[in-house]
């Protein structure tokens, strides 16, 4: 059973509200937008298996302590009930558009153990907190959010986010195919990773951004 934003269950809506509050509490007036993309924006969200994919845009850079504070709160909200995946971008890194875009915060299931060790002190340093880092995936996230995204907080995504050139988008969804390691992720991620590769091929043919499910049909 799939759903979109309008048909989300109360627990998932509460989780989304909690995530938005995490960012609003810490960024206040410097939070420009919180947007949903991914399967939810494409109407193929399956509770509680699908990730809640979010893109956050800030009006200033985030210092390390703020990133760690956000990470602690997001870690507690993760999988209650849905897995969370999000990237936070500084608006100054989006305008003018450059590829790969620079990311200043990222959280996903792949990095949850790293954050656990950062939060309990076993790990002292990590690029996720210590640097702004280039991320090839951002081009795909920005374009999907701009075209199909759901606004949770802020202005409509098409007013805030830049247009992503076709060449950058294509490189974003297919650039790592040759070196992609399906088994570098948790076993639960394997079907989704396979379908992500199929989605890239489907875009080449259809020139339309499809969900992983629809691309696999």
Regions found by a protein language model. Give the residues of each.
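Short amphipathic alpha-helical segments
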Residues: 192, 196, 214-215
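CN hydrolase (nitrilase-like) catalytic-core segments centered on the catalytic cysteine
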Residues: 198-209
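Helical scaffold of the NTase/Pol beta-like nucleotidyltransferase catalytic core
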Residues: 1-35, 65-66, 71
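Conserved NTP/Mg2+-binding pocket subregion across the NTase superfamily
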Residues: 2-8, 72-187, 194, 200
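Catalytic metal-binding acidic patch
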Residues: 36-73, 83-90
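Short helix-terminating capping/connector loops at secondary-structure junctions
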Residues: 28-30, 48, 79-82
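Short, charged amphipathic alpha-helical segments flanked by flexible coils
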Residues: 208-217
């Amino acid at each position: 059973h799939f759903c979109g934003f309008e048909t989300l269950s109360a627990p998932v809506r509460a989780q989304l509200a909690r995530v938005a509050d995490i960012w609003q509490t810490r960024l206040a007036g410097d939070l420009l937008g919180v947007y949903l993309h991914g399967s939810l924006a494409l109407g193929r969200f399956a509770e509680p298996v699908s990730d809640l994919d979010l893109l956050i845009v800030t009006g200033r850079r985030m210092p390390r302590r703020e990133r760690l504070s956000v990470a602690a709160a997001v870690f507690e909200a993760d999988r209650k009930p849905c897995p969370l995946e999000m990237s936070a971008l500084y608006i100054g890194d989006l305008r003018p558009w450059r590829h790969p875009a620079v990311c200043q915060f990222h959280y996903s299931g792949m990095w949850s153990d790293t954050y656990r060790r950062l939060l309990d002190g076993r790990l002292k340093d990590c690029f996720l907190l210590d640097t702004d880092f280039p991320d090839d995936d951002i081009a795909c996230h920005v374009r999907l959010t701009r075209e199909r995204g759901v606004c949770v907080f802020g202005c409509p995504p098409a007013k805030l986010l830049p247009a992503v050139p076709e060449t950058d988008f294509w490189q974003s969804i297919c650039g790592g195919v040759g070196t992609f390691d399906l088994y570098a992720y948790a076993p639960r991620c394997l079907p989704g990773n396979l379908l992500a590769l199929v989605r890239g091929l489907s875009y080449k043919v259809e020139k339309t951004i499809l969900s992983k499910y629809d691309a696999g049909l």
